[in-house]
């Protein structure tokens, strides 16, 4: 089985090198690795390009700089749909365990071919503090909830998707950051894909810093603004477009605005409301289709 790893990176050269090293030190090597670089600084891009050249079968792309979803689309569209069976999305601060790819192949090998085509497998990530992130379900309000049943969402940097899925669907580029993996999984479920929890797939998060570290508004951080804007967007899309239910949509909006107003008042940040709405881009859900077609990439360097 041919597995491609798509690495999205932004301003973290040291972590990128460690991420690539872990992938290529795997007991079973990836078929190919694609690095899509959203770094703004040309000098950092040059450093990252040189790092990539140290690893065989690794492609370097300059990123679109329109958010994590556009960056992931840029990476996955550089993989061959004819020459790739499964795709993993690995952030630059992730180090896979040496048996990650071997365990994924072993799990897929146990399935009939037709089941393989429609199965997404997801493992577990462990933070630098030892906290584990597990596959989950989405609550009515759009929060991730632990489950012992069939998951509805994946741990994105410890998951594998059939490559054919991205010939049908793409990451939603109207989500800048936050809940983008939940939205993608909702579309996969709607298209009859199944998500299978595979705890033997293990990865480690090696960074405690976010690329979104920046001043927020009042007592709400920049990261939280993006997360809550994305939760609003995904919640509306869930009940309006993906699984239409006017009553659930109305209930979701009522609860969201009531709870968010209380949260902002408690933080002394009620003035953040307009910025959350602006970042959510919910008006696009009433306009044209917002999922891009798969496009071939440019600016490719193969080491």
Model features per residue range: what roles?
Residues 21-30:
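Short, acidic, metal-binding catalytic loop of nucleotide-sugar glycosyltransferases
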Residues 22, 35-48, 94:
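A conserved acidic beta->alpha catalytic loop
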Residues 31-40, 61-63:
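Short beta-strand/loop segment that forms part of the nucleotide-sugar
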Residues 63-82:
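Glycine-rich, basic loop-to-helix element that forms the pyrophosphate-binding segment
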Residues 99-134:
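Conserved donor NDP-sugar-binding/catalytic core segment of glycosyltransferases
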Residues 143-161, 218-219:
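A recurrent flexible, glycine/aromatic-enriched loop bordering the glycosyltransferase active site
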Residues 177-186:
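Acidic donor-binding loop at a coil-to-helix junction in glycosyltransferase catalytic cores
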Residues 222-226, 230, 240-303:
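Non-catalytic, C-terminal membrane-associated alpha-helical segments of glycosyltransferases
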